[in-house]
Amino acid sequence: MKHSVNRPPTPDEDDVADGFEKDKVTLREIINVKLVESGEKENLMELVRDRLVECGWKDEMRIACREHVKKKGRKDVTVDELIRVITPKGRASVPDSVKAELLNRIQNFIVSAAL
């Protein structure tokens, strides 16, 4: 910010761009609102949960959590730390078939909702 005695501060270009971005509604936000309003988001969440259980992903994450706790010691691990350590592994290990099915369902929703 550039300051002056006689006038309010002039925002830098970065500040103007940040303000503009905050006011702009993204396509992702619009789709999310439509998914929630229609109840489809809950259906998609249930689909993902079911598919992850079917493929054994949930069991893998449970094992990874237990191994981390065993390695660090039960009293020395916090939930926040466990989430921080396991989340990247979990996201990376979601099967491509689950991602593809979810993407397909979202695309079909967008087409049917005519967004």
Curated annotation (Swiss-Prot):
Places the protein is found: Nucleus, Nucleoplasm
Expression sites by tissue: Expressed in roots, cotyledons, leaves and upper part of sepals.
Keyword Transcription recorded: yes
Signal peptide: none
Biological process according to GO: chromatin organization; mRNA export from nucleus; protein transport; transcription elongation by RNA polymerase II
Gene: ENY2
Designated name of the protein: Transcription and mRNA export factor ENY2
Keywords of the record: Activator, Chromatin regulator, mRNA transport, Nucleus, Protein transport, Transcription, Transcription regulation, Translocation, Transport, Ubl conjugation pathway
Role summary: Component of a deubiquitination module (DUB module) that specifically deubiquinates monoubiquinated histone H2B (H2Bub). Does not seem to be a component of the TREX-2 complex. Seems to act independently of the SAGA multiprotein complex. The DUB module is responsible for the major H2Bub deubiquitinase activity in Arabidopsis.
Subunit comment: Component of a deubiquitination module (DUB module) formed by ENY2, SGF11, and UBP22 in Arabidopsis. Interacts directly with SGF11, but not with UBP22. Interacts with MOS4.
Keyword check for Transcription: yes
GO cellular component: DUBm complex; nuclear pore; nucleoplasm; SAGA complex; transcription export complex 2
